[in-house]
Amino acid sequence: MKLYVISNSNIMADFILDEFKDVPNVVQINFKQRKNALTSALKWIRLKMGNPRGLFDDTLFEKKFLDEISKIQPEDKVLLWSIENLKNTMLIANEIRSKDIQSFLWNPMLRVRRNNSAEEYKRKIKEYGIGLSTFDPYDSKMLDCRLMPQVHRAVEMPAIEHPEFDVFFVGQLKGREEPMSRLIKEFRDNDISYFFHLINGRHDTGDVAPEIKECIKDELMSYPETLANINKSRCLLDLTQKGQQGLTLRPIEAMMYKKKLITNNSAIKNEPFYNPDNIWILDDPDEKRSVADFMKNVPYTPVPADVEQRYHIRPWLDALWHAPVASAK
């Protein structure tokens, strides 16, 4: 029996699943969606015809992908990782022979929420016999599916005696300007150093405050560089997008690399690793400390190892299947 992980090709999924590069019974397959007017039409036609296996395969899928999934046997386990699009899920599920398919939703299902299509999503997933799980509590209730912890992979980092800056953030603006601007002003007033690498993207930088604009860069930061900057910092900043209750990767990185965390996600109080010594929640009515007090006067408290392990990819996969599918060394 093998475990096949079929994932949307992205930097973070590839980094996490690289944990298994030397594990022969865990195989990663990248799915790159072909998205154009023709493939959209062919998907619609194929699904209307009952989703017959093989129909329009040469147009819908890359040959390499088809070759890789053809090796999957009925007794193998398959995890669809972050393939949230329902049509893609149904097409892939009908192409593989596995009798044990799980789908992990790694993004908030905002489109399903907007379109009020949760019932159709649940019905189709059940029809295809797919086990469904998510990291987001709201989506877990909406889709009546299993709630799993956020998941990551830790790597060894060189010891740094003196951090270069207090607070580190990397990411897109995505409407985060107001809380970010407030924090920057408080950092400056209290001599708290920070390094923010903000991605311009489609955002109009002409409307943002000067303290935000000066942090905007034209190029993405690679994940190895992100890890290096995490290592150089004392605290990570986590600002979730509107509508997301599940954790981003920032809190997990903070825990794994023993950094403090500033976040606007009050749902983090429900996590077993939550400790107010380590985590300061923006705009939380129960938070009586200033961010300066939190940064300067409260020592970090390490998270118990058994708690931290719940968020590591190997035990996480074992927990998903209630079996040791990924624990081989």
Task: Enumerate the predicted regions with their spans.
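N-terminal pre-catalytic "stem/leader" segment of glycosyltransferase-like enzymes
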Residues: 1-98, 102, 106-108, 329
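Short, polar loop motifs at secondary-structure junctions
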Residues: 10-12, 133-141, 198-204, 264-269
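Active-site regions of enzymes building and remodeling cell-envelope glycoconjugates
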Residues: 23-30, 41-48, 129-131, 142-153, ...
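Structural alpha-helical scaffold elements that stabilize or flank donor/cofactor-binding regions
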Residues: 71, 124-125, 228-229
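Catalytic core of nucleotide-activated saccharide and alditol-phosphate transferases
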Residues: 84-188
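Catalytic donor nucleotide-activated moiety binding site of glycosyltransferases and closely related
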Residues: 184-220, 224, 266
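Catalytic binding pocket for nucleotide-activated donors in carbohydrate/polymer assembly enzymes
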Residues: 212-218, 223-323
